[in-house]
Amino acid sequence: MRFNSEVVPDRYVRIARAMGVNVGGRSNAEVIADGITAVRTLTADCGLPTRLREVGVPREALPELAELAAVEPAIFNNPRPATSAELLAMLEEVW
């Protein structure tokens, strides 16, 4: 969410609003940050895994996963282009 919010902030402000975040008089960056927190809280409250390691992804698989994701056709619909290095950084953050 944070990665894409830089290029399509209005989408993420709408998500934040839908999650109950107060948007009045606040910067997009503040609202988006609170929206991301709200989504993380919802995920945890639902008992869903929040880390790749919780679903059995080994850390050593992350570079290959990033390379595969960089050429996966769905990535071309992403609002912000991503390199395999950027994808790897995101995967490491959620591992």
Task: Name each model feature, range by range.
Residues 1-61:
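Gly/Pro-rich interdomain helix-loop hinge
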Residues 58-95:
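Short, amphipathic C-terminal "tail helix"
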